[in-house]
Swiss-Prot record:
The lineage of its organism: Bacteria, Pseudomonadati, Pseudomonadota, Alphaproteobacteria, Hyphomicrobiales. Mg(2+) binds at E269. Tetramer of two alpha and two beta subunits. This is Phenylalanine--tRNA ligase alpha subunit. Its cofactor is Mg(2+). Coiled coil: none annotated. It is found in: Cytoplasm. One of its GO terms (cellular component) is cytoplasm. Belongs to the class-II aminoacyl-tRNA synthetase family. Phe-tRNA synthetase alpha subunit type 1 subfamily. Its EC number is 6.1.1.20. It catalyses: tRNA(Phe) + L-phenylalanine + ATP = L-phenylalanyl-tRNA(Phe) + AMP + diphosphate + H(+).
Amino acid sequence: MNDLEQLERQILEDIAAAVDEQGIEAVRVAALGKKGTVSEKLKTLGGMSPEERQMQGPAINGLKNRVTEALSERRTELRKAAVAARLEREKVDVTLPVRESAASRGRIHPISQVIDEITAIFADMGFSIAEGPDIETDYYNFTALNFPEGHPAREMHDTFFFNPDEKSERKLLRTHTSPVQVHTMEKFAAMRDKEGRDELIRIVIPGKTYRMDSDATHSPMFHQVEGLVVDKSANVANMKWVLEEFCKAFFEVPSVKMRMRPSFFPFTEPSVEVDIQCDRSGPHVKFGEGNDWLEILGCGMVHPNVLRMSGYDPEVYQGFAWGMGIDRIAMLKYGMPDLRAFFDADVRWIEHYGFRPLDIPTLFGGLSA
């Protein structure tokens, strides 16, 4: 047995004896490193005569290739073994009884709880829940809501756009849940025209929305809820009553003072922002008392252009709509300081702020439970 064969046998034995990736790396350095045994053999080729190099070169290079391949195979084997061992170690027997601990019982996320609370309150007022796609067309997200091409209000939304499809139709992640209002009005208008059923629209629309914004009080994905009423006699007084009843029920106070400030939204006219009376002197906001005011939502009468584009004659029908951020009012009601924690999947956070699975939405007296 010559020196190369003896060296190869020794290296292969060392490779086989390695029990982890650190051991494999040590063998690689000893054999193929800058001062490794195989590397030293390769260096001797430079001092050989052409005849000797022609004889020894293929043998030494072949040794290097076989060692490299053996190292790779052994490393793969060890990685597979490590994964198998980890799977065996972390295997869960699903037939075992659940251990009675806070973590094992799980918690309802505050966003899910607040959505349940909101929809339950409006359901008691006779509203139904409507939903729509997260991916919308430019038409439904902007144009049908009275955002004309080039309107500066479009620039107010830092929007996630998709590349145009084969129909050259620009799509995007919706920046608000308002497109569902248009879809619903179109559906009811078609039903009225085809079947003669002129039904009142009363819907509440919870869902995810998307904008390029991220800080302690903003997230690129956030939750929003909107409401819409369309009828021949809908008016601002109706809207104010609905919102007052909602605020009392949601914040669980017997009365609430509201003030409406003129504002601007392309899809409503007139448009107002709603503040409610509160006390912000302590660590948590208290509603229904104090001398402070806090903005809660935006609302207004549905713009005639929106009604018209959705199949309703604004000379006959009127509507009102409102919208609010679910994440924000959840933070206000339950005292959560940082919006980003909603999406961190921290078990400690969800144990503190989460709700038991059997909790029912908290409804104020006067609404059914």
